[in-house]
Amino acid sequence: MIGQIKVLGKSKEEAEAEALKQLEAVGLADRADFKPGALSGGQQQRVAIARAVAMHPNVLLFDEPTSALDPELVRGVLDVMRDLAKNSGMTMIVVTHEMGFAKDVADRVVFMEGGVVVEQGTPDVIFNNPQNPRTAEFIGAIA
């Protein structure tokens, strides 16, 4: 809430209401009073997303948001991100190895290797008709 108060100039009451609204959106309103250590990794990630969204950014960056999670927790985080992509109108830049998620949610996919862009295009092109042999090799390996 401090970011909303200090940066956005909201009152404590407005910040609390926005925080609760965003926790509700990620399915964690019932955990509003919990300390981070009392939350699972997936819940912590969803709280982090709620905190970021509460600041009403135009662009939200995600760097491997599911990489440190147990497999059973990944879906909850991806569901929150999928909902944001569909309903927020916010630009999201996501670094991920979750190819199914990228294929379903992205407007544009950039395939990189060694910090270099290998190929970029629509999900249809990248996943179904890659133009670069390295992209094709990667897609073939995960199919």
Predicted region positions:
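Catalytic Walker B motif of ABC-type/P-loop ATPase nucleotide-binding domains
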Residues: L60-D63
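H-loop/switch region of ABC-family ATPase nucleotide-binding domains
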Residues: T96-H97
